[in-house]
Amino acid sequence: ILDAIDSGKITNTEIRVVICNNEGAYALERAKNYGTEGLLLSPKSFETREEFNQKLLEALKEREIDLVVLAGYLVVVPPCVIQEYENRIINIHPSLIPSFCGKGCYGLHVHEKALERGVKVSGATVHFVDEGTDTGPIIMQKPVMVEQGDTPEVLQRRIMEQAEWKIF
């Protein structure tokens, strides 16, 4: 997304903050390189989940965020944030929802399940976030062919390159 804004592919858009729960994530370095604020905010840094939830909501409100884009964010978005930003939180999921989604279906697990099932087509889905896991209304999907001999890692890379990076 940062690259698309930088190249002019996406216009009239500003990324005000990149929020990450993983201190070593490349996203924070990329944000810094683009002159965008990077904010490390992990549930592990708070005594209770409620404290984290409120801090996350405050961080978004303080920066007057219009749209929340989840890209590799593996923390469950708290209900207080979903309610405050109803129909303004979008996520990318590395499968064609409703296949291979929901609790436990993230990262390589998605592609392992797809290959175990023997699907011929997988892909990516952009959807609104609601209080379920990968259950919000679908905005867009892009299919990607599964090839003979694919490993989860190879399929993951192909889906990122041919679908996720194109539609998100």
Predicted regions mapped to residue ranges:
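One-carbon transfer enzymes
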Residues: I1-F168
